[in-house]
Regions:
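Short, low-structural-confidence N-terminal segments
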Residues: 1-96, 100, 263-267, 313-333
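Non-catalytic accessory/assembly modules
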Residues: 4, 147-153, 157-182, 186
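Acidic/polar surface patches and capping/hinge elements
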Residues: 36-37, 163, 172-206
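FKBP-type peptidyl-prolyl cis-trans isomerase
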Residues: 45-76, 110-116, 168-180, 204-212, ...
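Second-shell loop/turn segments in exported
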Residues: 48-54, 92-103, 112-122, 135-138, ...
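Soluble non-cytosolic domains of exported or imported proteins
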Residues: 61, 93, 97-110, 122-129, ...
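Acidic helix-start/capping segments at beta-turn-to-alpha-helix junctions
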Residues: 84-93, 107, 113, 123-144, ...
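Peptidyl-prolyl cis-trans isomerase
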Residues: 221-261
Length: 333
């Protein structure tokens, strides 16, 4: 099976995190299909139900696809790997590692599907167009539609299952964009984001960066000018234009310990201003106006927190009869 695993899936990443304990059940379907190399290599029916993750079914076909990817990663570093050899101090073998890591890869995709279903988020029109364009790139790369489908067959995966895996990546992006877009159904309320920002010590600020021999003088002059301006945001934009700098708007960041610029910003009240002269000994000075954090930027990191939480809370149920019967060495060789 090894020579058939052609890795042309740029962007598909398999986590090395190991899966913890999960429930087992004998009530899942074993499947009937006998199509494809995956069945020949494993004896498992592609349409069999290998996993149920947060209500999403993972077929043997999808699981074995991820198992092959994990095995590819292992053999890239250890071409002559002994799948029965221990890889961890507690005796976990390379085969057990590969099987559990394949569960983790499937879990990531299943959690995306479950979250999108719960939130009512479907693949966007833009993502659908990108998927179509990506598929055409694959077809062009392999020379024809027939050649592309042959490559999928060599990988042992159906076009339907492969398309679903690709769709999950774009669906994750659509979830992220919806979550980070003010006004969308997924966007967290301002109070939640404000509390989260306070917990993590996020600060917001308009920042002017000045370099050159007269940076210190310019910083002090611009501070005085900016303080006198009635419309601070408008004045910031005008100064950036005069300095031929990009007006980046509010920068949202967390405090950094023992950092002179960060310390100066942290010391300011909201609306406070200061000039920070050459904090790093490199001749660069800064003028800073402290603001509330940009909540749209806070939402981006809050999404990551919720994603990790959903991954941790995901329920994983395995078809123990099928899972325990997977012989990694025989499957991959």
């Amino acid at each position: 099976m090894r020579s058939n695993w052609i890795r042309f899936l740029a962007g598909v990443l398999v986590s090395v995190a190991l899966v913890g304990a999960f429930a087992v059940t004998g009530g899942m379907k074993g499947g009937r299909s006998t199509d494809g190399l995956l069945y020949q290599a494993s004896g498992l029916h592609p349409d069999g139900e290998m996993l149920a993750i947060s209500g999403q079914t993972v077929t043997c076909e999808e699981y074995l696809f991820w198992l092959g990817m994990v095995c590819d990663n292992v053999t890239a570093s250890l071409p002559d790997v002994d799948w029965s050899a221990a890889v961890t101090g507690d005796g976990m073998t390379f085969a057990e590692y590969a099987k559990t890591d394949a569960v983790e890869a499937a879990k990531q995709h299943a959690v995306v599907r479950a979250w999108a279903q719960q939130a009512g988020v479907a693949l966007s029109d833009a993502s659908t167009l990108e998927l179509d364009a990506q598929r055409q790139q694959y077809v062009a790369y392999y020379g024809s539609e027939e050649a592309y489908l042959q490559q999928l067959a060599l990988m042992g995966i159906s076009e339907e299952a492969y398309d679903r895996i690709l769709e999950d990546q774009y669906l994750y992006r659509d979830l992220y964009q919806a979550f980070c877009t003010p006004g969308s159904s997924l966007y967290a309320d301002d109070a939640t984001l404000t509390d989260y920002a306070a917990q993590l010590g996020y600060m917001g600020a308009y920042v002017l960066k000045l370099t050159g021999d007269n940076a210190e003088t310019m910083a002090n002059d611009l501070l005085e000018r900016w303080q006198a301006a009635e419309d601070k945001e408008k004045e910031y934009a005008l100064i950036c234009e005069e300095l031929q700098q990009t007006a980046d708007g509010i920068v949202t960041l967390t405090a950094v310990e023992d950092d002179a610029l960060s310390d100066a910003m942290s010391a300011l009240e909201i609306g406070g201003m200061t000039a920070v002269i050459d904090p790093y000994g490199e001749g660069t000075s800064f003028v800073v106006l402290r603001t509330e954090p940009d909540l749209s930027a806070v939402a981006e990191t809050y999404f990551d927190v919720l994603w990790n939480q959903k991954m941790e809370e995901a329920t994983v149920v395995t078809n123990s009869k099928l899972y325990d019967g997977v012989d990694v060495g025989a499957f991959y060789e």
